[in-house]
Amino acid sequence: MSLFMFNRSVSATVKYFTASSPPAQRVREFGGTHAFINEQGREILFNDGYRKAANFYKMFASQLDAGVLWIDRGLKSACHHYDPDTGSGMWFWPNAAEKCSDFFSKAQNLWQSKKHARSIFFLGAATHLVQDLCVPHHAACRLFGGHVNYESWAEKRKLDYKMDRGGIYDISGHPEDWIVDNARLAKEHLCLVDNNSTEDYHRATKALLPRAQFTTAGFLLLFYKRI
């Protein structure tokens, strides 16, 4: 395939997947915490010496962010939880570890089928889950209990926790293990996000938002090495 045709394929696919998203929601999500973490993941890859991988994901940045947006819409958000103590998710829904593995495998298969933009779209969905499990409420399967308040607080202050090097690359060759590992750390910080304390929010976020950026870099490199 020529470079021109490849770029046209990428553009057409991402337009298809984002066309049905409400404009306000699309602006909010693409400018939000997940897109910020994706961007920092690319920067971490670059600064850690994985420049080819970083440039690859820069080329596919919009597709990755489109997948991040899509998985937060509708009932798909019910699968964003994983309790590391029980190995379960929210109620009868598949847990985040299962869904992450499914999306990662789908992304690999699509890439091998030359459906590149669609592949990175589903990788974005998998990466979103890795990031979500750095939030204590997702690791405790809690929809309430200050969940929205904490995420809103962290969203407004995300630039204070910006990382640009030192990615985590050695968790596992299995996508689901990245969910489990992040969930273990996040749940340890649950007590800090229960009481709306700014000081406690800071203590939790200082550990967890950098973790989301570091593991995003590692998770993206895992996929890059597979293709």
Placement of each model-derived feature along the sequence:
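N-terminal, motif-rich segments that launch catalysis or mediate targeting to/interaction with membranes
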Residues: 1-113, 121, 139-226
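Active-site alpha-helical segments that house and flank conserved acidic catalytic motifs
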Residues: 118-140
